[in-house]
Amino acid sequence: MTNIRKTHPLLKIINHSFIDLPAPSNISAWWNFGSLLGLCLIIQILTGLFLAMHYTSDTSTAFSSVTHICRDVNNGWLIRYLHANGASMFFICLFTHVGRGIYYGSYLFLETWNIGIILLFAVMATAFMGYVLPWGQMSFWGATVITNLLSAIPYIGTTLVEWIWGGFSVDKATLTRFFAFHFILPFIVAALTMVHLLFLHETGSNNPSGLNSDADKIPFHPYYTVKDLLGVLMLLLFLLLLTLFSPDLLGDPDNYIPANPLNTPPHIKPEWYFLFAYAILRSIPNKLGGVLALVFSILILAAFPLLHMSHQRSLMFRPLSQCMFWILVADLFTLTWIGGQPVEHPFIIIGQLASILYFTIILVLMPVSSMIENRLLKW
C-alpha cells in the first residue's frame, strides 16, 4: 500500500515541499533563514491576533489600550513584547536571507528573487504601519514624516498624502486604516511566501558552490528538518532572551509618551531596521531626490540579476567580489548607525559618503570586480 502522504491531494503537496523534497547535500546554515522567516511570520500572526483582541484603533484610546494589554491582560506584556521584538528578529532573518541570496548568486532564480523583493516591500509596509498603532510620540511623528514623503511626487503628491491620511493630518482615520492594513498584510505575505516557495521548487535550491547539484541530492526530511530545528531553537532563544531581559532595548523611549501633534520630538527616527534607508533618504538635500533614493535603495535588489557579470554563480571562489560584498555589509552597518544620529556635522557627510558608496558598490564595483576575476581566470 502506498503511503497516504504520497497519494492524498493535500498531504502530497506538503510531502513534495517539506518531506521528500530533493535538496542539495551541501547547503550550509545560511539556508536556514527561509524556514526561520516562516516561523517569524507565524509568531507575528499569532501574537498579533491576541493583541488585536484587546487593542482599539481610536486615537483617544489606542495608547491606553496598549497600556491595558501590558498591565491587565494575562501575560499581555509578554505577547506585546514578543510581537515587538519578533519584528526585529524577522528583519534580522530577512536581511541575512537577502545577503545570502546576493553572496551565493541565488538571485539568478528570477521569479523567486522578484517575489522575494515584493515580500520585502510588503513586510516593510506591515512593520511601518504596526509601529504607528501604539500611538506614542514616535508612532505619530514617524507616520507624519514618512507619509509626508509622498507629497514630493509631482502634481498628485499633496492629494495623495491627504487621501492616505483620510484628512488634513495624521488622525483617527489614518490610525483606523493603518490597523486594518496591518491586520490584512501578514496574510498577503503568507500567500506570497507560498508563491515564493512554488517558484523555488520549480528550480530546486541553490548551494554554496553555485554548481549544479542534481547528481547529489538528499531528502529534506530528516536531514534539513533537523537542521532547521536547531535554527528554530536558536531563534527562539534569542527572541526570549531579548523579550524577557531587555524588551525595550530596540524600542524608542519617546513612544511611551502619548502622541501629541503640538509637540515634536527632538529626533524623529524609525525602528532600527529602517535606519539604513532613512540615512539614505536624509543624505540627499532635495525632497524628491531623497524619496527616489529611498525607494531605489531597496528596488536596486532587482538589478542584481542584470549586473551579474561573472562566469561563476557564487562568490565562494571569488575573493575580490567577496571583499566588495563585505564592504557593502560594513557600509549598511554604517548607514544604520548614521540613521539614528542627529542631522549635524560630522554625521551628515558620513551619511552622504556611505550612501554614495552603497550605490557605487552595487552598480559599479561589484560588476567590475566580476569582470576582473573573469579576466584573471582567462574566461
From Swiss-Prot:
GO CC annotation: mitochondrial inner membrane; respiratory chain complex III
Topology class, membrane: Multi-pass membrane protein
Keyword Mitochondrion: yes
Co-factor remark: Binds 2 heme b groups non-covalently.
GO molecular function (one): ubiquinol-cytochrome-c reductase activity
Top-rank taxon, per record: Eukaryota
Gene Ontology BP, a term: mitochondrial electron transport, ubiquinol to cytochrome c
Key words, A-Z: Electron transport, Heme, Iron, Membrane, Metal-binding, Mitochondrion, Mitochondrion inner membrane, Respiratory chain, Transmembrane, Transmembrane helix, Transport, Ubiquinone
Binding site for heme b b562: 83, 182
Transmembrane segments: 33-53, 77-98, 113-133, 178-198, 226-246, 288-308, 320-340, 347-367
UniProt xrefs under CDD domains: cytochrome_b_C, Cytochrome_b_N
Additional notes on this entry: Heme 1 (or BL or b562) is low-potential and absorbs at about 562 nm, and heme 2 (or BH or b566) is high-potential and absorbs at about 566 nm.
Function: Component of the ubiquinol-cytochrome c reductase complex (complex III or cytochrome b-c1 complex) that is part of the mitochondrial respiratory chain. The b-c1 complex mediates electron transfer from ubiquinol to cytochrome c. Contributes to the generation of a proton gradient across the mitochondrial membrane that is then used for ATP synthesis.
Assembly: The cytochrome bc1 complex contains 11 subunits: 3 respiratory subunits (MT-CYB, CYC1 and UQCRFS1), 2 core proteins (UQCRC1 and UQCRC2) and 6 low-molecular weight proteins (UQCRH/QCR6, UQCRB/QCR7, UQCRQ/QCR8, UQCR10/QCR9, UQCR11/QCR10 and a cleavage product of UQCRFS1). This cytochrome bc1 complex then forms a dimer.
Entry similarity comment: Belongs to the cytochrome b family.
Protein name: Cytochrome b
